A protein has these predicted regions:
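A detector for short, charged/polar N-terminal pre-domain segments
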Residues: 1-2, 70
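Core segments of cupin and vicinal oxygen chelate
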Residues: 2-5, 11-56, 89-92, 96, ...
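Charged, low-complexity surface patches
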Residues: 13, 83, 107
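Conserved short beta-strand elements that form part of the metal-binding/catalytic scaffold
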Residues: 31-74, 116, 120-127
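A short, polar/proline- and glycine-enriched secondary-structure boundary/capping micro-motif
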Residues: 68-70, 101-102, 133-134
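Mid-chain, well-packed structural core segment of small domains
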Residues: 71-94
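A short, hydrophobic/aromatic-rich structural module that often spans a beta strand
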Residues: 77, 99-119
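A short, polar/charged loop-to-alpha-helix boundary motif
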Residues: 128-137
Length: 137
């Protein structure tokens, strides 16, 4: 079992997830996940897939304000999700290297932390980790 996190996907906040997913699908050649019968106007989260695996996600944020880059009053913002074989081991690891666990934990299969400068990231339980851990898969 590997206690080190493995990057699951990268999520970007945005005002229109479908539009931004379409843009990045065209940039990368990756596929936007199928909506099925889900109404496009209600999409608040959508992922780009590399085969069966998500790689990028786009999350709707009401009143989204674009960052000013490379300098300006609103720095660039994003969050990362990392797969782990075991949430407890992953937590010990990230706390040991300087992360802070947030008081609010909204789910059972993931945990939210802050990096040393306050950006949120999640450790997500990888339910189907390959035998021998994620590093072997």
């Amino acid at each position: 079992m590997n206690a080190l996190p493995l990057l699951q996907l990268f999520a970007l906040d945005c005002p229109d997830p479908l539009a931004l997913a379409d843009f990045y699908a065209r940039v990368t050649g990756l596929e936007v996940e199928a909506l099925g019968d889900f109404p496009p106007e209600e999409v608040t989260w959508i992922e780009l897939l590399n085969g069966d695996h998500p790689t990028l996600a786009f999350q709707k944020v009401d009143h989204y304000v674009a960052p000013t880059w490379p300098e300006g009053p609103l720095p660039q913002q994003a969050h990362l999700d990392f797969w782990v074989d075991d949430l407890d081991q992953g937590e010990v690891h990230v706390l040991g290297v300087g992360a802070t666990k947030t008081d609010f934990q909204p789910g059972d299969t993931f945990r939210v932390f802050l990096d040393p400068v306050g950006h949120p990231f999640c450790l997500v339980l990888h339910a189907a980790a390959p035998e021998g851990g994620l590093a072997s898969g």
